[in-house]
């Protein structure tokens, strides 16, 4: 059982608007559902396909708004981030983990990260964005070993 943690404080009576990228992915679904445990947040669940089974499941939750957005499409992110207070951003090395071999992994995730960061900056400059959370990886490599880290680890580090 999870202990409910208040991650954002607000003196305003209106709900904080929290955008969650890749909302239908494993991590995104968990974030959306956890935030939805209280009535304090309006959650903007950003996904490539708002008609997918997972998206429709999220859309049935209170306080959840489905928004079409793709980390590979900066304009869709710009629209999705308008008027948000908080952005939870995560990236993926592949589209559905099917292309998990070779350099495409790194370049795909780096492009997502570049688009995400640029649109977060735009949202901050033009709106009311106060918090940005980027889901990354830490300590995934043993510093005592000389093994190279996998590309999908180093790409997250470089996005940071």
PLM regions: where:
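Active-site Tyr-X1-5-Lys
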Residues: 150-160
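Active-site "gating" loop of Rossmann-like NAD(P)-dependent oxidoreductase/epimerase domains
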Residues: 7, 138-151
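A structural signal for isolated positions on well-ordered beta-strands in alpha/beta enzyme cores
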Residues: 42-44, 65, 131-133
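NAD(P)H-binding glycine-rich loop region in Rossmannoid oxidoreductase-like domains
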Residues: 48-123, 140-144
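SDR active-site strand-loop-helix element
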Residues: 21, 46, 90, 134-137
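Hydrophobic residues within alpha-helices
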Residues: 27-31, 116, 159
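Structural motif
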Residues: 17, 85-86, 131
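N-terminal Rossmann NAD(P)H-binding glycine-rich loop of SDR-like oxidoreductase domains
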Residues: 3-41
